[in-house]
Amino acid sequence: MSRVAKNPVTVPAGVEVKFGTEALVIKGKNGELSFPLHSDVAIEFNDGKLTFVANNSSKQANAMSGTARALVSNMVKGVSEGFEKRLQLIGVGYRAQAQGKILNLSLGFSHPIVYEMPEGVSVQTPSQTEIVLTGSDKQVVGQVAAEIRAFRAPEPYKGKGVRYVGEVVVMKEAKKK
């Protein structure tokens, strides 16, 4: 059995778990997420805890039980608490402005970048150089943050660009004459 799958997922109060024919549906205050059921993994719900057991003893079934447990755990956390990614803009003239579901970025290009948020992700800009992304799906929030960062990744000489809060950019030394 997978070491990850050995630990059950505790479902907090206010989170509903429904088993469908093809998917596990998790509902909470932050929305609803569904997880497609895999034929190699059996999921049981007892006393507010979800347990994951591999249907057979193959390596793939063990791996899938651990993967399923990790993904469902993230879904339970997402619908109850939510996920947040923070980005900061470092550079002269680099600005961000949120207008509803649209994020306008000025990153030193000749044109402004207009990024539309996907369903389930909200954006806020507490200051012109800070972006806060929130949502219930960890994968989607992380993907959006990575796409925004990719518009102008931090460069290694001055550190200018879009970076995650707390990210350490390894700086290079300038060429010497």
UniProtKB/Swiss-Prot annotation:
GO terms for biological process: cytoplasmic translation. It comes from Neisseria meningitidis serogroup A / serotype 4A (strain DSM 15465 / Z2491). Belongs to the universal ribosomal protein uL6 family. GO terms for molecular function: rRNA binding; structural constituent of ribosome. PROSITE patterns: RIBOSOMAL_L6_1 (PS00525). Keywords: Ribonucleoprotein, Ribosomal protein, RNA-binding, rRNA-binding. This is Large ribosomal subunit protein uL6. Pfam families: Ribosomal_L6 (PF00347). This protein binds to the 23S rRNA, and is important in its secondary structure. It is located near the subunit interface in the base of the L7/L12 stalk, and near the tRNA binding site of the peptidyltransferase center. HAMAP family: Ribosomal_uL6_B (MF_01365_B). Part of the 50S ribosomal subunit. The keyword rRNA-binding applies. GO terms for cellular component: cytosolic large ribosomal subunit.
